[in-house]
UniProtKB/Swiss-Prot annotation:
Protein's name according to its UniProt entry: Intermediate capsid protein VP6
Described purpose of this protein according to its UniProt entry: Intermediate capsid protein that self assembles to form an icosahedral capsid with a T=13 symmetry, which consists of 230 trimers of VP6, with channels at each of its five-fold vertices. This capsid constitutes the middle concentric layer of the viral mature particle. The innermost VP2 capsid and the intermediate VP6 capsid remain intact following cell entry to protect the dsRNA from degradation and to prevent unfavorable antiviral responses in the host cell during all the replication cycle of the virus.
Keywords attached to this entry: Calcium, Capsid protein, Intermediate capsid protein, Metal-binding, Ubl conjugation, Virion, Zinc
Domain of life, per lineage: Viruses
GO biological process, one term: fusion of virus membrane with host plasma membrane
GO molecular function, one term: structural molecule activity
Source species: Rotavirus A (strain RVA/Cow/France/RF/1975/G6P6[1])
Note from the entry: The VP6 trimer contains a zinc ion located at the center of the molecule. The zinc ion is not essential for either trimerization or transcription activity of the DLP. Zinc-depleted VP6 has an increased sensitivity to proteases.
Post-translational modifications: The N-terminus is blocked.
Impact when changing L71N: Loss of in vitro DLP assembly and transcriptase activity, and almost complete loss of interaction with VP2
List of residues binding Ca(2+): N266, D286
Pfam families listed in its UniProt record: Rota_Capsid_VP6
Length: 397
């Protein structure tokens, strides 16, 4: 993997910097590195593809070295370099695709394709010029079963979940009380509602709670907490739990009271926030508990009192909500996030070449399925294919 990264980095630099008119002295170190790559690769043969519709391709390396000059690089020099660069780039692209479509239930962190296994040999270590990528560093750590750490922006840590629970219900569905939520990606939105606006509740207050368990521990997380859940702020028709009927939800938004957020790790509270909104942080956690209250307004203007009558029918439904967004966090496991395209890169290649479903990943690389059942085998394989995708993205956008 180190060699593949170094190949890609060298080729990217060569493609960007070996251009007509450049002073040789400005790129002499790069050309020396480029020539070392050629010397190491010459005389070797590789084969890629042969899975799904990914075609089999054979690769042979027999290239001349780039020479030295006291002057600027001319058109002939650059053309010679370009021919070599283009072949190597095509090779790296195919090695990456070949690796991204393979998976293994055992030791999935290790190279799986014949070409990358061969590149892992000792004879190619002379190409290992650079090891600065976060993905490469973590791949090496994971390969040695040491602790890794990825920094994510808006990590896709929550499997998609959208549902409701009713704490009070009737066959007519005309006086409901309960909770709705939508968990997806890096965001939780939860709303508590009471058609009667807590008219008969103790102290005219309804208590709500929403608990979310993460599939992986997050650390040093920066989080945004808002006293609103905009996705539940407009009317909608909802199918009943048994699917036998539908019921009408017509929210009127109130501000939640006594908001408390707890971040827990292995059942122990690590951080707690009460009535604090905006930016908060959590040190390390695997569970989030949100609790909040709907309180009937003690004083109401006639217009507000008309919204919340003391008896049925209840045409407007008192609603309070919270939004929690994980803006950034560190995780020992690789995740899809908002700042990178690794999941899309891997999935698109597997779809384009009709790669059959293997023993590890779900059909279509369904992220909700993958993260819901994030086994050690999936973690190893995902870290490997994401690392390869990061290498490929240096050359192929």
């Amino acid at each position: 993997m180190d060699v593949l990264y170094s190949l890609s980095k060298t080729l990217k630099d060569a493609r960007d910097k070996i251009v007509e008119g450049t002073l040789y002295s400005n790129v002499s170190d790069l050309i020396q590195q480029f020539n070392q790559m050629i010397i190491t690769m010459n005389g070797n043969e590789f084969q890629t593809g042969g899975i799904g519709n990914l075609p089999i391709r054979n690769w042979n390396f027999d290239f001349g070295l780039l020479g030295t000059t006291l002057l600027n690089l001319d058109a002939n020099y650059v053309e010679t370099a370009r021919n070599t660069i283009d072949y190597f780039v095509d090779f790296v692209d195919n090695v990456c695709m070949d690796e991204m479509v393979r998976e293994s239930q055992r030791n999935g962190i290790a190279p799986q394709s014949d070409s990358l296994i061969k590149l892992s040999g000792i004879k190619f270590k002379r190409i290992n010029f650079d090891n600065s990528s976060e993905y490469i560093e973590n791949w090496n750590l994971q390969n040695r079963r040491q602790r890794t750490g990825f920094t994510f922006h808006k990590p896709n840590i929550f499997p998609y979940s959208a549902s409701f629970t009713l704490n009070r219900s009737q066959p007519a569905h005309d006086n409901l009380m309960g909770t709705m939520w939508l968990n997806a990606g890096s965001e939780i939105q939860v709303a508590g509602f009471d058609y009667s606006c807590a008219i008969n509740a103790p102290a005219n207050t309804q208590q709500f709670e929403h608990i979310v368990q993460l599939r992986r521990v997050l650390t040093t997380a920066t989080i945004t907490l808002l006293p609103d859940a905009e996705r539940f702020s407009f009317p909608r028709v909802i199918t009943s739990a048994d699917g036998a009927t539908t019921w009408y939800f017509n929210p009127v938004i109130l501000r939640p009271n006594n908001v408390e957020i707890e971040f827990l790790l292995n059942g122990q509270i690590i951080n707690t926030y009460q009535a604090r909104f905006g930016t908060i942080i959590a040190r390390n956690f695997d569970t989030i508990r949100l609790s909040f209250q709907l309180m009937r307004p003690p004083n109401m203007t006639p217009a507000v009192a008309a919204l919340f009558p003391n008896a049925q029918p209840f045409e407007h439904h008192a609603t309070v909500g919270l939004t929690l967004r994980i803006e950034s966090a560190v995780c020992e496991s690789v995740l899809a996030d908002a700042s990178e395209t690794m999941l899309a890169n891997v999935t698109s290649v597997r779809q384009e070449y009709a790669i059959p479903v293997g023993p590890v990943f779900p059909p279509g690389m369904n992220w909700t399925d993958l993260i819901t059942n994030y086994s050690p085998s999936r973690e190893d394989n995902l870290q490997r294919v994401f690392t390869v995708a990061s290498i490929r993205s240096m050359l192929v956008k």
